[in-house]
A protein has these predicted regions:
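Active-site microenvironments that recognize anionic phosphate/pyrophosphate groups
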Residues: 1-168, 174-253, 265-338
């Protein structure tokens, strides 16, 4: 076993006008991901979030979108008949259909609910259970039609800072014959670790994190929730689904466990006056060295003085940043989980 938690402590010395030009030292911590060896920076200063944003005007002005109940069955695309004879897939209130502007070989949308807008504390496990059930059915039917599609992502982009042009809550389901960069990094590193150690990195990581009690949140069924040692985004929370590399093999229990963890994280975000987020599930068929991973991050919230959370560090230097020490985040978020 060779999991190492490496970090560098950096200090910047200056004479601060906020302290009468007295000497101060400002710390930054650089951490190295134990699997991918990617670096991330923990930067804890930033603009404070004072209050919750009032979305009433934004929600009213955009209501009646293509995803609302009166339009979703008349103004959204249909699947090819060879894939879904009925054109769309419906489970409860969740509706799945092809993306009119796909970002991959197979791009689909899953509308999560009939409500045009939800605050983060209004999402429920049932909403995600139905949404994931639709996503799974889309993937199963598509791969039956095209077996070469091994790489799938199930993601949510919520609000403008999260990259969503539509307020109405929805998922993105994207399948390709080639992996994304992140999938390839995870897969290559997991495979390399397995061949060196003859054990699964993900099982070893969870065992170590449980023992350390610093970043492990809890287990809900077979889904193990934790905070990444070297996060790639703000307030990052991760989940590993034990015994699965693909979302298509999940049963109702695993889907429910994922849904509960997502909703728990969103309630924490809400109490922190956050309102925008992303999550992504990295699903890879038939990879024995890999385990299904979900990552969630918050985004800089919509507020009167909006500050984008992606700077030249992230965009041009490929060095991602986080706004909170993972150990502190773990202590704060644990009570939100069942």
């Amino acid at each position: 076993m060779e999991i190492k938690f490496e970090r560098f402590h950096l200090e910047s010395d200056l004479l601060s006008p906020l302290e009468g030009f007295q000497w101060i030292s400002v710390p930054t911590e650089v951490r190295i991901d134990p699997l991918t060896k990617r670096r991330s920076r923990i930067i804890t200063w930033g603009l404070p979030i004072k209050d919750k944003f009032d979305f009433s005007q934004m929600a009213t002005e955009s209501k009646g979108c293509f995803f609302c109940p009166e339009s979703v069955f008349s103004k959204t695309p249909k699947f090819l008949k060879e894939i879904v004879p009925g054109g769309r897939i419906v489970v409860g209130k969740a509706v799945g259909f092809p993306n009119l502007n796909p970002a991959g070989t197979y791009g689909s949308v899953v509308v999560l609910c009939q409500e045009h807008f939800l605050t983060l504390n209004q999402f429920t496990p049932d909403i995600y259970e139905e949404g994931f059930s639709v996503a799974l059915e889309i993937i199963r039917r598509t791969t039956a039609f095209d077996p070469d599609i091994h790489y799938w992502q199930v993601s949510q982009n919520f609000l403008l800072p999260g990259g969503s042009s539509i307020l109405h809550p929805h998922l993105q389901v994207i399948g390709d014959p080639i992996p994304t960069n992140e999938m390839e990094w995870l897969l290559d590193a997991s495979s390399s670790y397995y061949h060196r150690n003859r054990t699964l990195y993900w099982n070893d990581l969870i065992r170590i994190e449980k023992g350390l009690e610093k970043r492990f949140i809890t287990s809900i069924g077979k889904v193990h929730w934790f905070v990444s040692f070297a996060p790639i985004g703000f307030n990052e929370v991760c989940g590993i689904v034990e015994g699965h590399s693909s979302i298509t093999t999940l049963g109702k229990e695993e889907i429910s466990s994922l849904a509960k963890g997502i909703v728990s994280t969103l309630k924490y975000y809400y109490d922190k006056n956050l309102n925008s987020f992303n999550f992504s599930i990295y699903s890879i068929f038939g990879e024995a060295s890999y385990q299904l991973l979900i990552r969630m991050i918050s985004r800089t919230p919509i507020q009167p003085y909006y500050l984008n959370d992606w700077t030249s560090f992230e965009v041009l230097q490929s060095e991602l940043t986080s706004n909170i020490f993972p150990e502190e985040l773990c202590r704060e978020i644990r009570p939100y989980f069942p």
